[in-house]
Amino acid sequence: MDGDSSTTDASQLGIAGDYIGGSHYVIQPHDDTEDSMNDHEDTNGSKESFREQDIYLPIANVARIMKNAIPQTGKIAKDAKECVQECVSEFISFITSEASERCHQEKRKTINGEDILFAMSTLGFDSYVEPLKLYLQKFREAMKGEKGIGGTVTTGDGLSEELTEEAFTNQLPAGLITTDGQQQNVMVYTTSYQQISGVQQIQFS
């Protein structure tokens, strides 16, 4: 799905402002079946310019997660934090892009959990699929009909959340149950699911 090919603005058509202001109209082709990949476009049809840091996860959050994997006395250089920050953002874009392709093929606008699992399997991250599938099932069972923090949580194929920033600051307990039944002490950060009873963290290999 090429975002640039889905819009046509006046400058591309070579039409002056006076012409548009008259009784004539410029028709912009838009496929309603496409997802909202171009939501960041402004009213003129041109893409907004973003600072490089705007597309990354907050580096403080990335650093906090990294620090959990090293001894308390350990330190992490700034360039290492920035490197992981960029890698994580690229990974998210990589997975989401593949999931978005599936949505486009099936003429849907909303990426759901199954799309993410399908994308991870397609891109070779098979070892993550089964644990995530179990977690997604537990999550949906626990959140069914409940109110999420800061807004409504709906379940099913159109699973969506409106969560406040506070929801991303909590973490699950350290005891994890792996797919082979072994318990390990590994910290995994996620959204605020402390309130969900019966949800267990899963160790990824």
Curated annotation (Swiss-Prot):
Source organism (scientific name): Gallus gallus
UniProt GO molecular function: DNA-binding transcription activator activity, RNA polymerase II-specific; DNA-binding transcription factor activity, RNA polymerase II-specific; protein heterodimerization activity; sequence-specific DNA binding
Region (C domain): 141-201
A biological-process GO annotation: regulation of transcription by RNA polymerase II
UniProt cross-references to InterPro entries, sorted A to Z: CBFA_NFYB_domain, Histone-fold, Transc_fact_NFYB/HAP3, Transcrpt_fac_NFYB/HAP3_CS
UniProt similarity note: Belongs to the NFYB/HAP3 subunit family.
Name the record gives this protein: Nuclear transcription factor Y subunit beta
Entry keyword set: Activator, DNA-binding, Nucleus, Transcription, Transcription regulation
Quaternary structure annotation from Swiss-Prot or TrEMBL: Heterotrimeric transcription factor composed of three components, NF-YA, NF-YB and NF-YC. NF-YB and NF-YC must interact and dimerize for NF-YA association and DNA binding.
DNA-binding is among the record's keywords: yes
Gene: NFYB
Basic and acidic residues: compositionally biased ranges: 37-50
Region spans: Disordered: 24-50
Gene Ontology cellular-component annotations: CCAAT-binding factor complex
Subcellular location: Nucleus
Main location: nucleus
Functional note: Component of the sequence-specific heterotrimeric transcription factor (NF-Y) which specifically recognizes a 5'-CCAAT-3' box motif found in the promoters of its target genes. NF-Y can function as both an activator and a repressor, depending on its interacting cofactors.
Residue ranges: DNA binding: 57-63
Region (A domain), start-end ranges: 1-50
Record remark: domains: Can be divided into 3 domains: the weakly conserved A domain, the highly conserved B domain thought to be involved in subunit interaction and DNA binding, and the Glu-rich C domain.
Source species, domain of life: Eukaryota
Region feature B domain, mapped onto this chain: 51-140
